[in-house]
Amino acid sequence: MKISLTSARQLARDILAAQQVPADIADDVAEHLVESDRCGYISHGLSILPNYRTALDGHSVNPQGRAKCVLDQGTLMVFDGDGGFGQHVGKSVMQAAIERVRQHGHCIVTLRRSHHLGRMGHYGEMAAAAGFVLLSFTNVINRAPVVAPFGGRVARLTTNPLCFAGPMPNGRPPLVVDIATSAIAINKARVLAEKGEPAPEGSIIGADGNPTTDASTMFGEHPGALLPFGGHKGYALGVVAELLAGVLSGGGTIQPDNPRGGVATNNLFAVLLNPALDLGLDWQSAEVEAFVRYLHDTPPAPGVDRVQYPGEYEAANRAQASDTLNINPAIWRNLERLAQSLNVAVPTA
């Protein structure tokens, strides 16, 4: 199904508004979801709206929730998300952090009790657009674990994404590293299961602990587990994310004494800085440009057009989706059913 970006945003806004989400919050969520689809992250795009309906119906997300600063020490801020939509809460927190970097050159910010923050690269792009560098870790609580620790056969962690982003010179797209510490994100597994497509080898184990490519294994009565990317390396980063985001924010970790209500709650730890403070911008730009050209000059492997740096993939996808979105038929059917159940008009092609 091909629809315009305007229609896609309006559909998302209308679906959320029909569930008593305030207009400004619905706008932020809709914009974030559509941008995720444009970037090629369909697992964090419009396809997730049925999950948000479930969360709203179960009172697991606060439709009115807004970020509140509970500790302000100038270059250190702690926010509480009040269980609100992460795409709105996260945007508010990032805007506050960016303003502090403008004042002080750097900022550490934490956020607790946010509903699903969405695509973490979105916040990295916000920082990069302001000319700043971001490094963030996120943990996921209030749900059952879905990622097995290295050497384990059952889940003990969640997908705990990390993000690194910063501006690039000469009009190049920003550098954006946005990765789950699992081999694939849980929402990616959800999309694969919905589309009936196999998961990559080495990304999932079944309930018996054996490898499988059946993504639906993650959503059955006896679910399996995602594996950490890179074995012990991804596992270690997942543990770091759990402690930085879960403990330093005050939001908690996935350990079983904390609630597991069934709907993802995110905690965030982020560092932002102005890269122009220490060294001259001219030298920095020239050095980054030389490094990028060095990467681009790498002879490509068989079947590969060219080597890219992280962030170029998203930028190319966004350029291709400058006016319209191509939505998978199975995902579109789910959106149609959701809209019709809320008496929301469905756009036509």
Swiss-Prot record:
InterPro entries: Mal/L-sulf/L-lact_DH-like_ah, Mal/L-sulf/L-lact_DH-like_NADP, Mal/L-sulfo/L-lacto_DH-like_sf, Malate/L-lactate_DH-like. Pathway: Fermentation; pyruvate fermentation to lactate; (S)-lactate from pyruvate: step 1/1. Its EC number is 1.1.1.27. GO terms for molecular function: L-lactate dehydrogenase activity. Residues 199-219 are annotated as: Disordered. It catalyses: (S)-lactate + NAD(+) = pyruvate + NADH + H(+). Keywords: Cytoplasm, NAD, Oxidoreductase. It is found in: Cytoplasm. GO terms for cellular component: cytoplasm. The keyword Acetylation does not apply. It holds the Pfam family Ldh_2. The keyword Calcium does not apply. Gene3D superfamilies: 1.10.1530.10, Hypothetical oxidoreductase yiak, domain 2 (3.30.1370.60). Its main location: cytoplasm. It comes from the Bacteria. Coiled coil: none annotated. Belongs to the LDH2/MDH2 oxidoreductase family. This is L-lactate dehydrogenase. It comes from Cupriavidus necator (strain ATCC 17699 / DSM 428 / KCTC 22496 / NCIMB 10442 / H16 / Stanier 337) (Ralstonia eutropha). The lineage of its organism: Bacteria, Pseudomonadati, Pseudomonadota, Betaproteobacteria, Burkholderiales. The gene is ldh.
